[in-house]
Amino acid sequence: MINKIDLPSAQPEEVRKEIEDVIGLDASYAPCVSAKTGLNIQDVLEAIVEKIPAPEGDPDAGTQVLISTIDYNEYVGRIGVGKVDNGTIRVNQDVVICNHHNPDKIIKTKVSKLYEFDGLNKVEVKEAGIGSIVAISGISELHIGDTICSPENVVPIPFQKISEPTIAMQFMVNDSPLAGQEGKFVTSRHLRDRLFRELNTDVSLRVEETDSPDRFKVSGRGELHLSVLIENMRREGFEFAVSKAEVLYHTDENGKKLEPMELAYIDVPNEFAGAVIEKLGQRKGELRNMGSISGGTYTRLEFSIPARGLIGYRGEFMTDTKGNGILNTVFDDYGPYKGDIQYRKMGSLIAFESGESITYGLYNAQERGTLFIGPGEKVYSGMVIGQTGRSEDIEINVCKKKQLTNTRSSSADEALRLTPPRILSLEQALDFIDTDELLEVTPTNLRIRKKILDPTLRKRAMINKKA
């Protein structure tokens, strides 16, 4: 099925050819549809009936169910979801679990509850046969890729290995001066329980405890993967802080450093192609292919680029292409380390004093760069309140009030015009933070801050780093 043909840049015939060339599948029959508008959906339903074969298997053979996803419920625990490939599965049936991660580990257990799906709802059943998509609860040791077998037929089903994490972030308890004021769950126990609970449903996530009980290393398959987790936790009422993403390196048999490489597929209007090529070149990207699409108005670029080269780039990409570019990435392989990358060339505007931002103070600050906050917002010393136009950080007092005299009155502040602040989204904030900064995440606010809040200690740390 080829979706989104309602878009101006849609090229269904080119996509058919790419599917055949890259994947090797015959795409000549693939329906061209628009899920958004409902165009040609009837063709999809007819193709399902015509092209997809009925389930095959031996109903008299031993039970075989391959677990393809994991759900979680606080009342019943882990719920394994998979398709019955052979035999039948029944409630209270004795079964054996073939562990995908440890083939020598065989677990004997019993099916306590069995469900089939009716739309988005689970319906409890007594048994299910070949082709049924079932949910099985009561087995705490289930993992994606495991096979549930009958004891007399312990034969695991081959499973595609899930790709390993490529980047990591530090999740930590928020210790800023505003900590605990906006979140419902703020302690290290809350944070730990939530992160380890996520492992029940997200098999590509890794959570490790560190030498500090208030800090956890969380690894995932990219910035987007971890940003979804952060946003979900934020909406649930959690308050915490995260560090800048860092790449997970490997070493080869000769001890040489290897880094994760991504394939980036980019569609941009022709006038922006040069800027994109330049930026990705600075980030150690290698242009592999370039062509014209959409009747010659768009350029398609294919890059091989280190995963760390994409950290913080999506925001720049949308700015450089004025929102008209499309960027898709996929993990390729581990390759030789490409060398150092200069991530951010602009410094931060840092609040010098704690308090409430004042129009007068912000008016003076906006001459130094782009502001992230407006008047009347809580700030603290060491909090990043904007971006400078230069490479170094600048400390500034946005809580500063104008001294009143007989000829100066507070009403004169009304004549000061502030440029509207740049409000960062979660993805933009994660892109912006530098290695010496943290992102403070609460249900109501996103604040960027320096890891070391005290200006004297921060300067001393910078001197020691350069020494």
Predicted regions and their residues:
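Internal insertion modules embedded within essential enzymes
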Residues: E127-I130, V134-V155, F159-I167, V173, ...
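Long insertion/accessory domains within large nucleic-acid-processing enzymes
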Residues: F117, K122-V125, L258, I305, ...
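Charge-rich, low-aromatic oligomerization/scaffolding segments with amphipathic character
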Residues: I19, D146-C149, K217, E223-E239, ...
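Catalytic P-loop NTP-binding/switch module of NTPases
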Residues: D85-P213, R235
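Conserved catalytic-core segments of large NTP-driven translation/proteostasis enzymes
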Residues: I23-I144, I148, E246, A264-D267, ...
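GTPase G-domain guanine-specificity segment
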Residues: K4-A27, E46
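Conserved nucleotide-binding/hydrolysis micro-motifs of P-loop NTPases
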Residues: K4-S9, A35-N40, D71-E74, N86-I89, ...
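Charged, conformationally dynamic linker/hinge segments
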Residues: V154, I162-S292, R308
